[in-house]
Amino acid sequence: MSCPRAVHSAATIGNHLLFAGGYNSTTGKYLSTVESYDASLTRSTAVELSSAKNGLASATVGEYAMFAGGYKGNSDAAYVATVDAYNTALTKTTMPDLSVGRYGLASAVIGDYALFAGGISKISSTADKYQDVVDVYSA
C-alpha cells in the first residue's frame, strides 16, 4: 500500500480489488485514497473518495463496488452519509446518500441488493447514537 492505514474498507469489482479510506496513524490524517490491485497484483490509484474518512463499509452489487458512510473527524459533520461507487473501469459515481450519516456500519449483499446496517451517529455534542437503520441499494 502507498501508506500505513487502518479502519479502511475493501471491495472487489471486475478484475480489481479496491482498498478505500482509513486512518494513517503516522500522519494523524483520515484518508480519501482508493488503491486498486488488478489480477496480476499491479497497484494503481483510483479516483479518490468524496471525502477523507475511516470506519466506512463496502459492498459490491451489480456493476458497482460501493463504499458507504464513515467518520472524518471531531465535528458535528463528522459522520458521513455519502456512498461512493466504482464500476469495472474504476470510474466513480456518487449514489444517493445513506438515510443517516454514520460509521462502524456493517454491509452485506443478498441477491441484487447491498444492505448497509447499523453504525454510530452523533445526536449531540457529547452523545453518540447506535443506529438500527438499514439502507438498501439495488444493482
Residue ranges and their predicted role:
Residues 1-139:
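Kelch-like beta-propeller repeat domains
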